[in-house]
């Protein structure tokens, strides 16, 4: 029963796991709230549970705190690299243009650079796509206080054709000398032009967003 799980020494491991799972769940909410502006355009129905699962894995890499007290921020945040927020439109299966990311913790600057590329060659777009844009965001995550700072940048809506884009350089500024964990995300959003109006393609079902 509940009381026994809460107090019986035999359930010590269960309590420790539950404590860390709860922390991972709250941490997932911090991340989702932080990047909400971009996440609302690119997510699947299971993103909450998938994100919690990988944050449990991050927690397990914490070599500082004892079991049951391990935290996300003391774990290896690189475990999150490549996490896809929409399994129906993975960035890794969408954007094939080489890109470079950079984070200068002293200055607080976060960058995404993509050399000029031909969209129809380097982007695997869903049927019906006429236009797209590249988005990038970065967030300082204060898990202990369930707070965050978020900034984002994006290209204009660009034509999906065979002509090379201009080089893309997206940059945002976070707090200089921050001691908090920082997560950077990048994505592609698809559009369909109808009578001069831009509409999110299939309500964003195939938009991509990933931790980079």
Map each language-model feature to its residues.
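Charged linear interaction tracts used for macromolecular binding and regulation
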Residues: 59-203
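Low-complexity, polybasic segments enriched for Lys interleaved with small residues
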Residues: 200-212
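Long, polar/Ser/Thr-enriched low-complexity segments
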Residues: 1-89
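Short, low-complexity, polar/charged sequence segments that are solvent-exposed and flexible
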Residues: 14-15, 47-49, 131-135, 155-157, ...
